[in-house]
């Protein structure tokens, strides 16, 4: 069922706000759902939606893990 879908995607936010190393860490069992989750992260990175890392950030990159689940009707 759609409610059981959950995928875990890991990636790195670079200093300029772009992303690298997008990978599915835990698959949902649905190739389409996993691909859509990766595409969402890639699109956000391309749009620099995460913003640049703060100048005071102690490093060149920030590793991040997102968990995706489908949003049902409200």
Predicted regions and their residues:
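A short, well-structured alpha-helical segment
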Residues: 18-52
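Short, acidic, Ser/Thr-enriched surface-loop or helix-capping motifs
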Residues: 13-14
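Conserved beta-strand and immediately adjacent loop positions that scaffold enzyme active sites
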Residues: 9-10, 21
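Short, small/polar residue-rich loop motifs at catalytic or cofactor-binding pockets
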Residues: 3-8
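Short, positively biased Gly/Pro-containing turn/loop motifs at secondary-structure boundaries
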Residues: 1, 38-74
């Amino acid at each position: 069922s759609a409610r059981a879908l959950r995928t875990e995607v890991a990636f790195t936010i670079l200093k300029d706000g772009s992303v690298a190393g997008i990978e599915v860490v835990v698959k949902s069992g649905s190739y389409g759902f996993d691909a859509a989750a990766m595409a969402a992260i890639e699109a956000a990175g391309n749009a620099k939606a995460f913003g640049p890392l703060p100048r005071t950030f102690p490093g060149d990159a920030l590793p991040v893990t997102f968990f995706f689940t489908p949003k049902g009707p409200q």
